[in-house]
């Protein structure tokens, strides 16, 4: 896991510069079952803690998740470490409206801030695309360790695809 955290730190540093906003987009951690609103498993809780540790000191000013337990529980350790509450954006109106609302809120953060967005396998790539990732990584139901880091500022967005926490196994 240490190597993963070092890789994450390198990804954040490679896209961060003065006057630029950084958006970190991840899928929720591993879940206990396949019900409609499951809690995180022990592995998911460990992943949420690893994310918070990796983002400590990154200037996180906004944490966004869906109302579902697994996204909120993944986001909560980072929010708590930054003294923030998790902002919840639901799916009223469907996925396209959700994606647009998340992207709009992320863009409203201060210009030098870091925003954490925790989504789902079907929303993470679309949120990344809405924020300027021309080639977002598709996620399978087994992908929990991927993250997209996007630097928004003058010019085209800078995008880094990275992994964090323990590697997830293939489906």
Question: Which residue stretches match the model-derived regions?
Answer:
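Short beta-strand segments
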Residues: 118-120
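Active-site-proximal alpha-helix that buttresses catalytic centers in soluble enzyme cores
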Residues: 20-110, 124-171
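Acidic/histidine-rich alpha-helical segments that form the ligand environment
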Residues: 113-116
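Bacterial N-terminal signal peptides
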Residues: 6-15
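Positively charged n-region of N-terminal signal peptides that target proteins for export
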Residues: 1-4
């Amino acid at each position: 896991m240490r190597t993963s955290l070092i890789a994450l730190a390198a990804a954040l540093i490679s896209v961060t510069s003065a006057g630029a906003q950084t958006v970190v987009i991840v899928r929720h951690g591993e879940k206990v079952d396949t019900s409609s609103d499951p809690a995180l498993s022990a592995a998911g809780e460990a992943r949420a803690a690893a994310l918070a540790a990796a983002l400590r000191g990154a200037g996180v000013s906004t944490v966004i998740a869906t109302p579902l337990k697994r996204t909120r529980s993944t986001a909560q350790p980072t929010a708590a470490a930054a003294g923030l509450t998790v902002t919840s954006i639901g799916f009223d109106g469907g996925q396209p409206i959700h994606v647009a609302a998340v992207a709009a809120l992320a863009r409203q953060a201060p210009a030098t801030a870091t925003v954490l967005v925790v989504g789902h396998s079907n929303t993470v790539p679309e949120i990344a695309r809405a924020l300027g990732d021309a080639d977002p990584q598709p996620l399978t139901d087994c992908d929990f360790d991927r993250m997209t880091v996007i630097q928004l500022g003058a010019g085209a967005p800078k995008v880094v695809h990275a992994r964090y926490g323990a590697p997830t196994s293939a489906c």
